[in-house]
């Protein structure tokens, strides 16, 4: 068995920044540091931060007064921000800047009284945060669609005053079809020059397509609640390659590889490289050889830290 590694894979700039915000807050202020929602959707990362003093909660009413709170990389609604401000909580915002870009778009549509359609997965925290940027008091509304069927059923107030945005971690292929359906149904709809799917999601999806074309089995390292990791598994399967989403080496079954000569490995944007290395080690223990890195698109993007953490971490 030969191992092939997708490139790029694993952590993106937004995830790096979010994890570093929690780490630096723990270093500068000491535990406990409260984090609203899992800072990124990866069990290994969350458990590591929890062991160092991070406390993960789903709502701010679980947070005591006079503590530090971090908003997760997925972003939060305006209502959550207002609740935190009203309580005087010290907040560090780990929202991915590319998610914030979508928030700004939605807020502008709201101010302009323009109805907005969000393409995304119901119940995902990023979707909840993005929907929560829209203030319907200006007379508009925001709608959520996931697929072409949702578009066909959608009833809007003013089809000539519409715009769309997208969740950042969707399948590019699926989203393109939904956008086409929106433009067909609502010819005057506006939107971003390109969809809002982030560079890292696009790069990892392109890489897994290449990987699936060269391998007999694909392993996607990522947690079950990770949207972008699930999309990677789906893309590999659509290319006719068996694919498995695993948190780590302990989730693998030897029988998956009985007929496999080439095993591909990738990782979602919230999965650390240490988990990939653990998978490689286990496969080698089962007789696999090598670990060839495929050619891929280089990523050199970084996002800045909040100023207070940047400065105080140097003291």
Swiss-Prot record:
GO MF entry, a single one: 4-hydroxy-3-methylbut-2-enyl diphosphate reductase activity
Record: residues binding (2E)-4-hydroxy-3-methylbut-2-enyl diphosphate: 41, 74, 124, 168, 226-228, 270
User: Which reactions appear under catalytic activity for this entry?
Assistant: isopentenyl diphosphate + 2 oxidized [2Fe-2S]-[ferredoxin] + H2O = (2E)-4-hydroxy-3-methylbut-2-enyl diphosphate + 2 reduced [2Fe-2S]-[ferredoxin] + 2 H(+); dimethylallyl diphosphate + 2 oxidized [2Fe-2S]-[ferredoxin] + H2O = (2E)-4-hydroxy-3-methylbut-2-enyl diphosphate + 2 reduced [2Fe-2S]-[ferredoxin] + 2 H(+)
Instruction: Name one process (GO BP) from the record.
Output: dimethylallyl diphosphate biosynthetic process
Sequence positions that bind [4Fe-4S] cluster: 12, 96, 198
The protein's UniProt keywords, in alphabetical order, are: 4Fe-4S, Iron, Iron-sulfur, Isoprene biosynthesis, Metal-binding, Oxidoreductase
Which EC numbers does the record give? 1.17.7.4
CDD domains registered for this protein in UniProt? lytB_ispH (cd13944)
Kindly identify the residues recorded as the active site.
Answer: 126
Cofactor mode of binding and number, as noted: Binds 1 [4Fe-4S] cluster per subunit.
Which residues does the annotation say bind dimethylallyl diphosphate? 41, 74, 124, 226-228, 270
Q: In which pathway does it act?
A: Isoprenoid biosynthesis; dimethylallyl diphosphate biosynthesis; dimethylallyl diphosphate from (2E)-4-hydroxy-3-methylbutenyl diphosphate: step 1/1; Isoprenoid biosynthesis; isopentenyl diphosphate biosynthesis via DXP pathway; isopentenyl diphosphate from 1-deoxy-D-xylulose 5-phosphate: step 6/6
Residues recorded as binding isopentenyl diphosphate, renumbered to this chain, are 41, 74, 124, 226-228, 270
* Pfam families xrefs: LYTB
Q: Report which superkingdom the organism of origin falls in.
A: Bacteria
Q: What cofactor does its activity depend on?
A: [4Fe-4S] cluster
Q: Which NCBIfam families does the UniProt entry name for this protein? A: ispH_lytB (TIGR00216), PRK01045.1-2 (NF002188), PRK01045.1-4 (NF002190)
* Family statement drawn from the similarity comment of this UniProt entry: Belongs to the IspH family.
Q: What does this protein do?
A: Catalyzes the conversion of 1-hydroxy-2-methyl-2-(E)-butenyl 4-diphosphate (HMBPP) into a mixture of isopentenyl diphosphate (IPP) and dimethylallyl diphosphate (DMAPP). Acts in the terminal step of the DOXP/MEP pathway for isoprenoid precursor biosynthesis.
Under what name is this protein listed? 4-hydroxy-3-methylbut-2-enyl diphosphate reductase
């Amino acid at each position: 068995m030969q191992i092939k590694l997708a490139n790029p894979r694993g952590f993106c700039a937004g995830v790096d920044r979010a994890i570093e915000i929690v780490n630096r807050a723990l270093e500068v202020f000491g535990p406990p540091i409260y984090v609203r929602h899992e800072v990124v959707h990866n069990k290994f990362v969350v458990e590591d931060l929890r062991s160092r003093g991070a406390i993960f909660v789903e709502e701010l009413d679980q947070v005591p007064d006079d503590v530090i709170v971090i908003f997760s990389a997925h972003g939060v609604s305006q209502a959550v921000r207002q609740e935190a401000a009203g309580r005087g909580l010290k907040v560090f915002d780990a929202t991915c800047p590319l998610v914030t870009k979508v928030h700004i778009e939605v807020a502008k549509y709201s101010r302009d009284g323009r109805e907005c359609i969000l393409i995304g997965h119901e119940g995902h925290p990023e979707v909840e945060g993005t929907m929560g940027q829209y203030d319907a008091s200006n007379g508009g509304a925001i709608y959520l669609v996931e697929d072409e069927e949702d578009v066909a059923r959608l009833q809007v107030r003013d089809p000539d005053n519409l715009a769309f945005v997208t969740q950042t971690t969707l399948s590019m292929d699926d989203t393109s079809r939904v956008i086409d359906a929106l433009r067909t149904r609502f010819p005057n709809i506006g939107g971003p020059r390109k969809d809002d799917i982030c560079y890292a999601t696009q790069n990892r999806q392109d890489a897994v397509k290449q990987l699936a074309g060269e391998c007999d089995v694909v392993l996607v390292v990522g947690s079950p609640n990770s949207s972008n990791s699930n999309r990677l598994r789906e893309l590999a399967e659509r290319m006719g390659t068996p694919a498995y989403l695993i948190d780590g080496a302990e989730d693998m079954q030897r029988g998956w590889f009985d007929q496999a000569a080439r095993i591909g490995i990738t990782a979602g944007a919230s999965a650390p490289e240490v988990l990939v290395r653990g998978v490689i080690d286990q496969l080698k223990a089962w007789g696999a050889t090598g670990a060839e890195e495929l050619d891929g698109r280089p990523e050199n993007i970084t996002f800045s830290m909040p100023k207070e953490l940047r400065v105080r971490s140097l003291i």
